[in-house]
Amino acid sequence: MNLPYEVTNTKQYERDVKLAKRRGLDIEQLLAVVRMLRVNEPLPEKYHNHLLHGDYKGYWECHINPDWLLLYEKDTKIRIISLYRTGSHSDIFGNGKKR
């Protein structure tokens, strides 16, 4: 049996979640994805989970819905999922740089 991953998050992720709540997004959808990641369950294809490149090399991106993303890092050696950002494409990639 595989042990679950520890889940950590950034302060920016916490701010992003607050913004998502203010926008009326269903946070349960986000939490459902985090739960799947925590137990290393493969995400269904509808989430379009994939590795990023360039400035975001090493980060994973999945789509909670078409314009609601979750960016995270996954360290398989020490079994930690680090939640980095969540928000729209423009929230995260708007200026082309990491925030």
Map each language-model feature to its residues.
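Generic N-terminal initiation segments characterized by hydrophobic and/or small/turn-forming residues
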Residues: 27-28, 34, 40, 49, ...
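Short histidine-centered beta-strand/loop micro-motifs
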Residues: 19, 61-63, 73-74
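A short, surface-exposed loop/turn module that caps and links secondary-structure elements
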Residues: 36-63
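N-terminal first-folded block
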Residues: 8-44
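Enriched for short, Lys/Arg-rich terminal
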Residues: 1-6, 15, 25-27, 67-69, ...
